[in-house]
Amino acid sequence: MKQKVVSIGDIQVANDLPFVLFGGMNVLESRDLAMRICEHYVTVTQKLGIPYVFKASFDKANRSSIHSYRGPGLEEGMKIFQELKRTFGVKIITDVHTPEQAQPVADVVDIIQLPAFLARQTDLVEAMAKTGAVINVKKPQFLSPGQMGNIVDKFREGGNDRVILCDRGSNFGYDNLVVDMLGFGVMKSVSHGAPVIFDVTHSLQCRDPFGAASGGRRAQVTELARSGMAIGLAGLFIEAHPDPVHAMCDGPSALPLEKLEPFLVQMKAIDDLVKNFPPLDTAN
């Protein structure tokens, strides 16, 4: 099966090309912290020769608690993104939650993301498709990998074939997520070769069944990421924070920022190895 290439400016994303890092912070906590984190990612990825896209949310509209921090909002968030682009020359990915947000956000960033909980909302899909922007679709925790083909078809029917798919784990009973490594190949197949990436951070979430925030398994981020990269993926999606314990969202799953370089050294080594193997068809 021919693998589709999605171009983000000078960055090419495909399952058989060197992996792209979609990395940053969970939510924009402040302008200064966003600048600090983005600068660190840029420095490390340039040193290692890894194509890089900065990620952060301007609004976490799906927090468990009404009292949880959501972010600076659309207007202030777009200002921060514009400054990051001017300062560091980075491409940016962020999520949208309503049809009305799609075009204003696409006017600023390079990739707009369809959140997992909203992935079947047709009005939102149609609005995002109309922007012509590159789309990243998060696989819902409650949806099988094979069902992702229907979401891709919605975007293509809406005139947008610039679609990336992202796995972030699947429900395993109550309050737990697992990653089905066979699902990556299924998503490649049902999307006819669309780029597939792995959100290792959110796949590490686990919940207190009566709590107001997600827990996480940060200590296992490297082993889970290694497993995903061994499949042969278009990209890795990860969040890091200089002080995960005090992060405003999903700190228990975030990679400590100072561990980013040694972490990526390992991921690049696995990606280089796997993508230098000759094709091996075991179906026949």
Curated annotation (Swiss-Prot):
One of its GO terms (cellular component) is cytoplasm. Keywords: Cytoplasm, Lipopolysaccharide biosynthesis, Transferase. InterPro entries: Aldolase_TIM (IPR013785), DAHP1/KDSA (IPR006218), KDO8P_synthase (IPR006269). Coiled coil: none annotated. GO terms for biological process: keto-3-deoxy-D-manno-octulosonic acid biosynthetic process. Gene3D superfamilies: Aldolase class I. It comes from the Bacteria. Its main location: cytoplasm. Its EC number is 2.5.1.55. Pathway: Carbohydrate biosynthesis; 3-deoxy-D-manno-octulosonate biosynthesis; 3-deoxy-D-manno-octulosonate from D-ribulose 5-phosphate: step 2/3; Bacterial outer membrane biogenesis; lipopolysaccharide biosynthesis. One of its GO terms (molecular function) is 3-deoxy-8-phosphooctulonate synthase activity. It catalyses: D-arabinose 5-phosphate + phosphoenolpyruvate + H2O = 3-deoxy-alpha-D-manno-2-octulosonate-8-phosphate + phosphate. It is found in: Cytoplasm. Belongs to the KdsA family. This is 2-dehydro-3-deoxyphosphooctonate aldolase. It comes from Edwardsiella ictaluri (strain 93-146). The gene is kdsA.
